[in-house]
């Protein structure tokens, strides 16, 4: 997997991304199901904070993730871009390689970000980082390890998904902060 600097320049122009702000990737999807997805309003609130701090947010995912990406971009405000369904895997590689950091559910794109060495915060709900961790020293994992998790179910069998709703935006922001404020940009 090799990022293409020319590919990123093309994408920035094609997708109208901001040239003067570092990007942070959000990957809110998880093909397995909603029990692996951090709440959309939480992504939106985190995105709003990042935009206020001078970052732009790139929401990545498949066309199936477009509604979630729309909601996140709306909640985060100007400087957040829903790229779900608008990019190919090679484009996601270029965006992740250029991003200052990423916030992600346990998903395929999480593993792509880890392989690229992108600093990331990985959020685990119904799965466990003991089975499918991001293989990177630049990864921070947040996993509550509740009595009911990991359940490995697609939807929460108890109907509450506390394993994800219990992960607060502040906790994710704190885990993300060192990567955002690193002196050397990626």
What are the roles of these predicted feature ranges?
Residues 33, 66, 89, 129-130, ...:
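Flexible, glycine-rich phosphate/dinucleotide-binding loops
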Residues 6, 88-91, 147-150:
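A short acidic, often aromatic-flanked loop/helix-cap motif at beta-alpha or helix-coil junctions
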Residues 5, 40, 66, 166-170:
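Electropositive phosphate-/nucleotide-binding environments in soluble metabolic enzymes
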Residues 13, 17, 52, 74-78, ...:
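Secondary-structure boundary motif
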């Amino acid at each position: 997997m090799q990022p293409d600097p020319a590919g990123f320049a093309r994408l920035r122009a094609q997708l109208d991304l901001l040239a003067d702000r570092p990007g942070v990737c959000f990957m809110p999807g998880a093909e397995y199901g909603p029990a692996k997805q951090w709440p959309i309003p939480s992504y939106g609130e985190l995105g709003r904070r990042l935009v206020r701090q001078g970052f732009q947010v790139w929401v990545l995912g498949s066309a199936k993730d477009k509604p979630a990406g729309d909601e996140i971009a709306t909640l985060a405000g100007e400087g957040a871009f829903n790229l779900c369904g608008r990019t190919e895997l090679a484009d996601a590689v270029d965006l992740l390689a250029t991003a200052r950091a990423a916030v992600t559910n346990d998903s395929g794109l999480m593993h792509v970000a880890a392989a690229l060495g992108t600093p990331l915060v990985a959020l685990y709900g119904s799965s466990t980082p003991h089975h499918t961790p991001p293989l990177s020293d630049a990864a921070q994992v947040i996993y509550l390890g509740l009595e009911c998790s990991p359940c490995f179910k697609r939807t929460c069998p108890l109907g509450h998904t506390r394993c994800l709703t219990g992960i607060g935006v502040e906790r994710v922001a704190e885990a993300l902060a060192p990567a955002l404020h690193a002196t050397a940009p990626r």
